[in-house]
């Protein structure tokens, strides 16, 4: 029997595993970097062990330190979560060599499926050894790849050699393995996967399908179960192939087999992920199971029932990220003041009200999941819940999620992996609520600050300025004997937390929350502007300011003050949340100041460089 589990991970998945362990009466152990010392997963655990340092390479990717932590804390089992070391066969061996229970598949199964070429061989899928014009387009892919790295689409035979060379170089850099292979390129196919669960007694469950076609930069955004619109033949084929993949490597535990389904309904095997997936909650909702609890039972040697439980209804999940669509999807940091969704929605998160969202790790704040008898009901429920959710803090992708769920192409289940290539610009176009600044101003009228326009005569117009969706807006109102008034609308009610406005005969209700100069009016985020700007905050035209806190990792070779630069030319690179972000010249001109140096830690708004346009 497992009595104490260390989760070799952080954030949302660590909290998720701890929840199931608590329900089972199992003691929990967390590990944490210095940056995560006060993180929610640390606060939830019964015990916690520090991994000195901040970078993932020094902490969550140090299998030796994590095994020592498990032994020191008295854990008898290790759950890897997902990401980090979850698909590292050497780590799995180190855990078992230390006499601990590994809550995952055998190391040999991890190794076999780590190589996409080896996985295809096990399933009898022949690679494209020789590419002809008839095979085009094709995809050059890293055998050990993932996340879009080490991949090149080839549409002309003349480009194949260069694509192979580039993919090999990228694969070596990203994965330390230069093996690549070529496969047919499925243009705008559907990403469909099968959840499997296997025990040590020969039983393998195929727990239905999931559709994860809505992806941006090869990262999943919205997932659902079951995959809609699959014909029974294809559904059976996908499940059978997934079970066959698991049996081919004597798999044990939870895993996912991924496919691309083309426009003709043909399935193309992608890979097998030998771990729990981020999107596992939609499968749990549909089948009424706890996959983590089943992982624990399988690891203890218990047998699964012969058949999985029946599926019921439909579930949809959306990933809420702290990222800014208006600034190249740059990860956002800062205080998360409040995160809450309406009742009936599952929220898996690794943070809570008051937590600081840092720069060091993945910017996902939470996963929101809705389950209902039908797909249409689940989609409607999730979209409405996200729209009404309180997400007070850094800028997020909330609007993208709501608009995606309500897009006609998604609603009719006609989406594919090219969805965001076609629609991202429209889905992220600013659509500010014109009444939001007035609601913010009226709520703020109950207290005066430097952000308001003070008047000796209350009946004179009051003016407050805000930025909203990247643009500046003014709100004007008056104090009268009967209360607050504004031109063009009727102020039905106004206090610091609730404003009700009537415009064109329609009443609009706004819940308002303010945190310093940050104001949340319903789902709209505004920033209050001071009436008298601080002169010390002014910067010269052409100033390049850090869009996020991070580390300057490099400056363009040979770049010095006085150099001529072209508009769009990369000048330096910032690293934040495991991603590099280019800082480019805003105009053609002269670099008159260069303040950044490699290794420098910067905060939001730090002056990096100045380009004087010519």
What are these regions (language model features)?
Residues 1-257, 261-277:
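N-terminal beta-alpha lobe that positions the nucleotide/phosphoryl donor
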Residues 149, 226, 362-368, 542:
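Short amphipathic alpha-helical segments
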Residues 156, 198-203, 262-265, 372, ...:
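Short acidic-glycine loop/turn motifs at beta-strand connectors
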Residues 185, 350, 371, 494, ...:
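Residue-level recognition of beta-strand microenvironments
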Residues 242, 281-284, 289-488, 567-570, ...:
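Catalytic cores of soluble metabolic enzymes centered on carboxylation/carboxyl-transfer
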Residues 478-483, 487-508:
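Conserved nucleotide-binding/hydrolysis modules and their immediate coupling elements
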Residues 507-547:
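Catalytic P-loop NTP-binding/switch module of NTPases
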Residues 535-614:
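Structured functional modules or segments
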């Amino acid at each position: 029997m497992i009595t104490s589990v260390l989760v070799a991970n952080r954030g949302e998945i660590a909290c998720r595993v701890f929840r199931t362990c608590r329900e089972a009466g199992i003691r929990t152990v967390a590990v944490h970097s210095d940056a995560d010392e006060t993180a929610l997963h640390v606060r939830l655990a019964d015990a916690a062990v520090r991994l000195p340092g901040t970078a993932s390479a020094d902490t969550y990717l140090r299998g030796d330190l994590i095994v020592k932590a498990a032994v020191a804390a008295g854990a008898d089992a290790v759950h890897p979560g997902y990401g980090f070391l979850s698909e590292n066969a050497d780590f799995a061996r180190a855990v078992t060599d230390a006499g601990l229970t590994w809550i995952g598949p055998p190391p040999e199964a991890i190794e076999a499926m780590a190589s996409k070429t080896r996985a295809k061989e096990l399933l009898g899928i022949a690679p494209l050894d020789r590419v002809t014009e008839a095979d085009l387009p094709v995809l050059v892919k890293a055998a050990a790849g993932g996340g879009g790295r080490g991949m090149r689409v080839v549409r002309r035979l003349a480009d194949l050699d260069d694509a192979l060379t580039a993919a090999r170089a990228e694969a070596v850099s990203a994965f330390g393995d230069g093996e690549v292979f070529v496969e047919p390129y499925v243009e705008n196919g559907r990403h469909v996967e099968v959840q499997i669960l296997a025990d040590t007694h020969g039983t393998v469950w195929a727990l239905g399908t999931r559709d994860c076609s809505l992806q941006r930069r090869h990262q999943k955004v919205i997932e659902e179960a079951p995959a809609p619109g699959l014909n029974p033949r294809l559904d059976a084929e996908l499940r059978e192939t997934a079970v066959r993949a698991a049996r081919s490597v004597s798999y044990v535990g939870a895993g996912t087999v991924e496919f691309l389904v083309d426009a003709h309904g043909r399935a193309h095997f992608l890979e097998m992920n030998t771990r729990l997936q981020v999107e596992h909650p939609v499968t749990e909702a549909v089948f009424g199971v706890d996959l983590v609890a089943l992982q624990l039972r399988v690891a203890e040697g218990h047998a699964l029932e012969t058949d999985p439980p029946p599926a019921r209804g439909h579930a949809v999940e959306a990933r809420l990220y702290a990222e800014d669509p208006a600034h190249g999807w740059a990860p956002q940091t800062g205080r998360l003041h409040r995160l809450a969704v309406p009742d009936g929605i599952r929220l898996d998160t690794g943070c809570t009200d008051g937590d600081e969202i840092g720069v060091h790790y993945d910017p996902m704040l939470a996963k929101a999941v809705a389950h209902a008898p039908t797909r249409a009901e689940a989609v409607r429920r999730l979209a409405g819940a996200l729209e009404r959710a309180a997400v007070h803090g850094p800028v997020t992708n909330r609007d993208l999620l709501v608009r995606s769920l309500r897009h006609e192409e998604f609603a009719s289940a006609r989406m594919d992996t090219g969805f965001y290539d076609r629609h991202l610009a429209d889905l992220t176009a600013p659509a500010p609520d014109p009444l939001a600044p007035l609601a913010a101003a009226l709520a703020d009228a109950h207290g005066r600050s430097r952000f308001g326009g003070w008047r000796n005569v209350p009946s004179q117009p009051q003016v407050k300025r805000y930025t909203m969706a990247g643009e500046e807006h003014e709100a004007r109102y008056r104090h009268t004997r009967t209360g607050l008034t504004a031109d063009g609308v009727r102020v039905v009610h106004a206090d610091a937390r609730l404003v009700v406005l009537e415009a064109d005969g329609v009443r609009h209700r706004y819940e308002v929350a303010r945190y310093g100069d940050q104001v949340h009016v319903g789902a709209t985020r505004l920033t209050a502007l001071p009436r008298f700007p601080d002169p010390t905050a002014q910067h010269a035209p052409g100033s390049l300011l850090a869009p996020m806190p991070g580390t300057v990792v490099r400056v363009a070779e040979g770049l010095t003050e006085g150099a001529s630069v072209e508009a769009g030319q990369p000048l330096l690179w910032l690293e934040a949340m495991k991603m590099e972000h280019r800082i480019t010249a805003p105009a053609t001109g002269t670099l008159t100041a260069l303040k950044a140096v490699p290794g420098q830690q910067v905060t939001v708004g730090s002056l990096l460089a100045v380009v004087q346009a010519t």
